[in-house]
Amino acid sequence: MASCLALRMALLLVSGVLAPAVLTDDVPQEPVPTLWNEPAELPSGEGPVESTSPGREPVDTGPPAPTVAPGPEDSTAQERLDQGGGSLGPGAIAAIVIAALLATCVVLALVVVALRKFSAS
């Protein structure tokens, strides 16, 4: 009976360690983001591009038209969560792996306690 319990716990331990590794293996790699202060790349053969028209100030047209503020029930309708295609970031993956390792340690401690209890009686 104890060997069957130990075999089950070992199988649970192995599956707890391997499941996060298998599930996080197929995450696509995202391109490296550029820094905000890096200069923009210019097309080959062209000089710097002027971003503003010389000598012209924007004309003030007055205050903007008032808009209807959304009610409290409409505040979440405009927000779109997780538009990145459903992939997890590196922090979330690390948290999942750490949680799996902690769960494995708890299961291992329970196995040790159970084996000591049954071997003592």
Curated annotation (Swiss-Prot):
Organism per entry: Homo sapiens (Human)
Ligase among keywords: no
Span of the signal peptide: 1-24
Key words of the record: Cytoplasm, Extracellular matrix, Membrane, Secreted, Signal, Transmembrane, Transmembrane helix
GO biological process terms held by the UniProt record: cartilage development
Intracellular or extracellular location(s): Membrane; Cytoplasm; Secreted, Extracellular space, Extracellular matrix
Extracellular topology ranges: 25-92
Residue intervals on the Cytoplasmic side: 114-121
Subunit architecture: Interacts (via the extracellular domain) with FGF2.
Expression across tissues: Expressed in cartilage.
Membrane topology, record value: Single-pass membrane protein
InterPro entries to which the protein is assigned, alphabetical: SNORC
Protein name: Protein SNORC
Physiological role: Plays a role in the regulation of chondrocyte maturation and postnatal endochondral ossification. May inhibit cell growth stimulation induced by FGF2.
Any single Gene Ontology cellular-component annotation: membrane
Disordered, as annotated region: 28-84
